């Protein structure tokens, strides 16, 4: 990890749980990353949370393996392909050697199991040879759960004693297909004793959808609002995930205040890349595991 990086420590999980979300800083994709420490210093000044939230701590120079969930900051890309920085997606057209090097830079990289995500509702228990899934569960310290995102909602879950963990990739398809509920069936702990963290994702002010998609989630409170353009709606995926978690019995849910679309200088955003006429974009990763 370079000295230009900053971390926000998320202290909602037990001390023996490692959990973090990467951003775009410190990678090798596009071979042209420059020092963005001045921008980073302005960007990271704490975080907002919901429910029984704890205040984040902005620190410099602390190992990413020291505590719990962390956001690693970055800079904005220029060019035709939005890979610049710590892209960990091997399926988006980036140079595979760069992606492998970026993955190797992640904390506890040797323990991470990478999924082939398909926007479904399959959850696998690690270790497993079957990796076509959108969520993973682990109760072993040698096997860390991870999901890649670039607007979709990453959800990290642990029991309050730090014995079981899960990582969930929840786009609208996964949320509709009850992937969160599927993941909870793997825990031996009662949902009331679980802790969930909803990571950076596209916010409800930036995710415009058509009426057909909006109607799929119309029964969620304050998560679908008409947009100015006729026939278009704004859909709030993070808060849909939050309502699902709460409905399933989880009492301690925290939300990142970062929007991947608004802060494409810090995160990869598929929708922002599309609107900016990029051919492709990278992926961040959310990781959770047991020490």
Question: Where do the model's predicted regions map?
Answer:
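Noncatalytic, beta-rich nucleic-acid-contacting surfaces in large DNA/RNA-processing enzymes
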Residues: 53
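Active-site microenvironment for binding and transforming phosphate-containing groups
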Residues: 1-50, 59-291
């Amino acid at each position: 990890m370079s000295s230009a990086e900053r971390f926000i420590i998320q202290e909602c999980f037990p001390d023996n749980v490692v959990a973090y979300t990467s951003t775009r800083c410190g990678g090798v994709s596009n071979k042209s990353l420059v020092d963005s420490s001045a921008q980073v210093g302005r960007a990271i000044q704490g975080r907002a949370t919901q429910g029984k939230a704890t205040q984040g701590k902005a620190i410099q120079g602390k190992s990413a393996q020291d505590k719990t969930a962390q956001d690693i900051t970055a800079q904005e890309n220029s060019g035709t392909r939005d890979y610049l920085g710590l892209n960990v997606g091997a399926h988006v057209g980036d140079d595979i050697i760069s992606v492998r090097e970026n993955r190797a830079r992640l904390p506890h990289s040797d323990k991470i199991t990478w999924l082939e995500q398909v926007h479904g509702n399959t959850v696998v228990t690690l270790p497993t040879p079957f990796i076509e899934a959108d969520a993973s569960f682990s109760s072993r310290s040698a096997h860390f759960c991870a999901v890649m995102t670039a607007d979709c909602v990453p959800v990290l879950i642990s029991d309050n004693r730090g014995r079981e963990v899960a990582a969930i990739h929840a786009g609208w398809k996964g949320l509709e297909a009850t992937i969160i509920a599927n993941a909870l069936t793997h825990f031996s702990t009662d949902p009331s004793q679980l802790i969930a963290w909803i990571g950076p994702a596209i916010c409800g002010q930036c995710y415009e959808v058509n009426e057909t998609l909006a109607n799929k989630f119309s029964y969620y409170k304050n998560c679908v609002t008409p947009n100015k353009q006729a026939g278009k709606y704004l859909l709030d995926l993070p808060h849909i995930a939050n309502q699902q978690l709460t409905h399933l019995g989880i009492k301690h849910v925290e939300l990142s205040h970062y929007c991947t679309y608004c802060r494409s200088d810090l995160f990869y955003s598929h929708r922002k890349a599309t609107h900016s006429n990029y051919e492709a974009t990278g992926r961040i990763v959310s990781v959770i595991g047991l020490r």
